[in-house]
Amino acid sequence: MAPLALVGVTLLLAAPPCSGAATPTPSLPPPPANDSDTSTGGCQGSYRCQPGVLLPVWEPDDPSLGDKAARAVVYFVAMVYMFLGVSIIADRFMAAIEVITSKEKEITITKANGETSVGTVRIWNETVSNLTLMALGSSAPEILLSVIEVCGHNFQAGELGPGTIVGSAAFNMFVVIAVCIYVIPAGESRKIKHLRVFFVTASWSIFAYVWLYLILAVFSPGVVQVWEALLTLVFFPVCVVFAWMADKRLLFYKYVYKRYRTDPRSGIIIGAEGDPPKSIELDGTFVGAEAPGELGGLGPGPAEARELDASRREVIQILKDLKQKHPDKDLEQLVGIANYYALLHQQKSRAFYRIQATRLMTGAGNVLRRHAADASRRAAPAEGAGEDEDDGASRIFFEPSLYHCLENCGSVLLSVTCQGGEGNSTFYVDYRTEDGSAKAGSDYEYSEGTLVFKPGETQKELRIGIIDDDIFEEDEHFFVRLLNLRVGDAQGMFEPDGGGRPKGRLVAPLLATVTILDDDHAGIFSFQDRLLHVSECMGTVDVRVVRSSGARGTVRLPYRTVDGTARGGGVHYEDACGELEFGDDETMKTLQVKIVDDEEYEKKDNFFIELGQPQWLKRGISALLLNQGDGDRKLTAEEEEARRIAEMGKPVLGENCRLEVIIEESYDFKNTVDKLIKKTNLALVIGTHSWREQFLEAITVSAGDEEEEEDGSREERLPSCFDYVMHFLTVFWKVLFACVPPTEYCHGWACFGVSILVIGLLTALIGDLASHFGCTVGLKDSVNAVVFVALGTSIPDTFASKVAALQDQCADASIGNVTGSNAVNVFLGLGVAWSVAAVYWAVQGRPFEVRTGTLAFSVTLFTVFAFVGIAVLLYRRRPHIGGELGGPRGPKLATTALFLGLWLLYILFASLEAYCHIRGF
C-alpha cells in the first residue's frame, strides 16, 4: 500500500500544476523558503529547508542531486528508526496505562439472605479508559506532534500536525479495518459487542471532522478564534461523558425496556417496548446467552456486583471445560493451565494488544507465553520449599487413637507407634488408664506401666482388661494416656537431657479413647450428628450410622433420602434408598449418597436422610418370646420376665434418626476461583516490578510466536532469524527505555510521566525529520503528513488490531476503538494546540491564522468516506454476513477491497488538491 501511495505522489510531483507554475529543478530551487511561504499560494513543495524544533538545517542548503538523494535516504531511515523508538517507548507507556486502569477496589456484596461476600472490581470504567488514557496512549505521537509543531514554530499553524491527525484517522478507518476484516479465518465473523458505545463514538468521530470543517471554512474562514479552539477542547470530556452514559444505559435507557431483533428480509435492527430483555445485542449480550438471574448471579444490584459475578462465572466455566479435557489432573494442577487459558480468552484492552504487537515485531516474544513460563519457573522452587522439614526427632503417639470393644471381649489391645528419628536410641514412655463414663474396677481393669522402644522398634502394644456384666447399660468409655518420655542409648542406659535438638518427643494423639459397647441390648441406631456439611466436589459422601448401647443379634435398618431445597434425581444429588444390615457385634455401617458437582461459586442446598424402624433378625429365644402374643397358652412367670427383658433389649431408633445434609460450594474450588480472578489481571502480565527485570527483558530475544495454545503446553520454540534481526535493530531503544521507572512504582504514574516526555522528545525529532525529508525531495508537508508520518504512527496500531481481531471473540478491541481515537485526536490534538495558539495571539491582539484549503478539503473528503465505511460496517451485521469482521469469502474480499480503495482515493485526491491539480476550498 505504501509503495502505491509513493508512486502516486511521484507522478503528482512530475505532473504540471493547475496554476501553470514552472516545475522546479534541482539546479534551480523555487523561491519559497518554507511551506509557510508556499502555503499562501504556491502549489509545489519547497526545496529549501528551514530549522526545525530540535534539528538544524543540513548545510549546505543547496546540495547537488546526488547529495539530495543521499540526504533523503538518511532522513527517511532516521525517521523509520525514530518510529521504531516511539513504538517501543509507547510499549512502556501503554503498560503504565494498563496498570493505572487496572487498579481495583474491594466491594462488599450483601445478598438477599443477609450474607455478605467480598470481591474486587476495577475502578476505571472500560469505556472511559478507552476514550481517555488508552486513546492517548495509542495516539500520543499524533497529538504531541500537533502540539509541538505549533509551540515550536512561534505559535504559527503548520500542516504536518493537522495533516498527520487527519491522515492517521483515514489510515485507521480504512486500512486498519480492512486488515481486520481480511485476517478473520474463513467461516468466522466478529461483531461489535457494545454497539451503543460504537454508535456514540462513531457519531462523535464524524461530528469532530464536521466541526473541524465548520471552524475552518464556515464560522471564520482562515482564522481559528479562541472560543472555537476552547470549544473543540471541551468537546473531549463531553464525548467521554456521552459514551459513559451509553455504556451505563442512562437517560432513556433506564425507563424503557426494548427487545431487539433483526428483520429476516431487510436485515434492519427492530426495537419494541416490552418485558425486560433476556438477550439484547445492543447490550453486548449475544443471542441465546443466559440472563444474570438464570446463572445464579446476584440479580438486580450494583454494576460492580454484576461485573464481579460475571468474572466468577467465566472462571468457573473455564475450570469446568478444563476438567473435561484433563480428567486426570487435580484442581491444583489445573490452576496454571486455567490461568493461562483465562488470560488468553478474556477480553483485553487496547493497551495489551498494542504491547503484544510491538513486542512481537521487535523480537521481545509473546507476552502471555513468557508470563506462563516465568510463573512455572517460580512455582517449581516454591513447591520444593513447601515440603515438611524433618527435625530428626522420633515421634511417639497412639495409632489409632479410637477403639471400640464389646463388654464381653475380655480385653482390648492398643497400639503405640514410634516414627522417624535416627533409630539408634532407646525410648521409655509411661502409660496409664483414666476414668471417663466407664469406671476402673467395675467396667475395666486399671492399668499403668512403661513401654520400651529399643533401637529399630517402631510399634508396641498394650492390653487393658474389660469387665463383663449382665446389666443393661449405656455405652461407656475410658482413656489411656502416654506420658513421661525418657531417652536411653543403644544399651538402654538413660541419657542426660542436653540442650541440643531432642532425639524423641510425644506428639498427638497422646490420649486414646476406648468405648465399651453393651452386649445385652440389640442397640440404638442413629446418625452421629443431626447436621452434616458436605462440599459439592466430594462426589460421594459417606454417612455413618452407629449402633450404640448394645450390639446383640442381626438387625436390618431401612433408610431413604428426602428432598429439601436440594433436588434428587441427579439435579443436586442421586436418590438413595435401601437397607443396612448390622451383624452380631457390628457397631457401625456406612451408607453412600452421590453428590452432583455443578461447580457453583456460592451454594447452600439441603436434603435429608431418614432411618426407618429397625428389624431384629436371628434373635433366637428372644424372637420367640417377642412373637408370642395372647395365644392359646399363657406364659409362665419365668417366660413373662424373659419376655419383658427381651422387650427392653429390642433394637430402637435413637434421637438422631433424621440427618440434614447441607451441600455447600467447594472451599478449594472457591479459593481457586478467587485466586484466578486476581491472577487474570493483565496488569500483572505486562507490568514490570524492577529495573533489573526491565534490563533483562531488553537484552533477551524471544520467539515472536503469535499462535496461542489454549493450555500453554506447547514447548517454547527458538527465535527465528527475523526475531534476531529485529532485536538487534531495536536493542538500543530497548536498553535506553529500560531506564524508565517500572510500572509498579507510584501505581504506574511514574512510568506514565517519564514515557510521555520521551514520546514528546522523539515526536519532535520525527516532525523535524519529516519536514527535512519533505523539503529535500520537494514533498509538501500536507502530503508528507498524510502518507509517511500517518503511516509510521499507525503501523503498530495495525498489528495490534490484527492480533485483537484474531484473538478476541468480538470486534470492539480491533475496530471499536478506531472511531473513539479519531475523535480524541481532533479534540485533544488540535484542541490543545489551537487553544494555546489562539489564546497567545489573542493576547497579542492578532488572530490565529490557519490555511483553510488543503486541511478543509482533506477533512471533508475523510468525512464523506467515513460515512460510507460506517454504513458498510453496519450493513455487514446482516445475518448472511454475520458481523463487521470476517464472514463469507466473497463479502469479506469485497469489503476489504472497498476500504483499501477508499484509502487510496483519499491519498490520491488529497495529493491532487495539495498540488493544485484539482480545486479545493
From Swiss-Prot:
Pfam families this protein is in?
Calx-beta, Na_Ca_ex, Na_Ca_ex_C
Where found in the cell?
Answer: Cell membrane; Basolateral cell membrane; Perikaryon; Cell projection, Dendrite
Tell me which GO cellular component terms the UniProt record holds. axon; axon terminus; basolateral plasma membrane; dendrite; dendritic spine; neuronal cell body; perikaryon; plasma membrane
Its name, as the record gives it, is: Sodium/calcium exchanger 2
Which family does the record claim for this protein?
A: Belongs to the Ca(2+):cation antiporter (CaCA) (TC 2.A.19) family. SLC8 subfamily.
Which organism is this entry from? Answer: Homo sapiens (Human)
User: What is the purpose of this protein?
Assistant: Mediates the electrogenic exchange of Ca(2+) against Na(+) ions across the cell membrane, and thereby contributes to the regulation of cytoplasmic Ca(2+) levels and Ca(2+)-dependent cellular processes. Contributes to cellular Ca(2+) homeostasis in excitable cells. Contributes to the rapid decrease of cytoplasmic Ca(2+) levels back to baseline after neuronal activation, and thereby contributes to modulate synaptic plasticity, learning and memory. Plays a role in regulating urinary Ca(2+) and Na(+) excretion.
Which residues bind Ca(2+) 3 per the record?
E407, D469, I471, E473, D518, D520
Which UniProt keywords are listed? Answer: Antiport, Calcium, Calcium transport, Calmodulin-binding, Cell membrane, Cell projection, Glycoprotein, Ion transport, Membrane, Metal-binding, Phosphoprotein, Repeat, Signal, Sodium, Sodium transport, Synapse, Transmembrane, Transmembrane helix, Transport
Q: Which residues lie on this side of the membrane: Extracellular?
A: 21-68, 153-164, 220-222, 741-747, 792-822, 876-892
- Provide a GO biological process annotation: regulation of action potential firing pattern
Q: Which residues bind Ca(2+) 2?
A: E407, D468, D469, D519, D520
State the InterPro entries in the record: CaCA (IPR051171), CalX-like_sf (IPR038081), Calx_beta (IPR003644), Na_Ca_Ex (IPR004836), Na_Ca_Ex_C-exten (IPR032452), NaCa_Exmemb (IPR004837), NCX_ion-bd_dom_sf (IPR044880)
